[in-house]
């Protein structure tokens, strides 16, 4: 499989002041760890990472000093006010490794007329191979009637994937639309 390649610079400075200067220069401080390797502190290009981060559970080839390693973005720290990425934690992985991650759900279709679908959970935890990580799991609510519930165990998983979330975790429910009752005008 082909993954985006990101050129990373080794990070020599640490602390709040260094991180602020790096972000002002268009870089994101990050750390990559795992696979019994020493953690590597790096700086990543902010513009390129913003594009890659649009996809949940993004995988990328991290190029550090002419070495390439496959990494999974594990945690993102964001400044919600300025809408910037402040720091990334990444996990070194192999394509055949099994990882436990939260996969977002994408809801398609419309429930039966006169009903409304209420979404209770937007992701589920699964264990699967790195090479099989989907962008999202599809939940089809087409034609579901009032009273129907969708649980985590009802979601179709990729081959070889195991559900980690509780099987009875409520994902969505279909309820009848409540009609507004008109009260008689006061006398």
UniProtKB/Swiss-Prot annotation:
CDD domains (alphabetical): Ribosomal_L25_TL5_CTC (cd00495)
Keywords on record: Ribonucleoprotein, Ribosomal protein, RNA-binding, rRNA-binding
Pfam families: Ribosomal_L25p (PF01386), Ribosomal_TL5_C (PF14693)
SUPFAM superfamilies given in the database record: Ribosomal protein L25-like (SSF50715)
A GO cellular component annotation in the UniProt record: cytosolic large ribosomal subunit
Protein name: Large ribosomal subunit protein bL25
NCBIfam families: bL25_bact_ctc, PRK05618.2-1
Its job: This is one of the proteins that binds to the 5S RNA in the ribosome where it forms part of the central protuberance.
Underlying gene: rplY
Species this protein is from: Tropheryma whipplei (strain TW08/27) (Whipple's bacillus)
Subunit structure: Part of the 50S ribosomal subunit; part of the 5S rRNA/L5/L18/L25 subcomplex. Contacts the 5S rRNA. Binds to the 5S rRNA independently of L5 and L18.
Family statement: Belongs to the bacterial ribosomal protein bL25 family. CTC subfamily.
An individual GO BP term: translation
Keyword Nucleotide-binding: no
Domain of life, per lineage: Bacteria
HAMAP family for the chain: Ribosomal_bL25_CTC
GO molecular function, one term: 5S rRNA binding
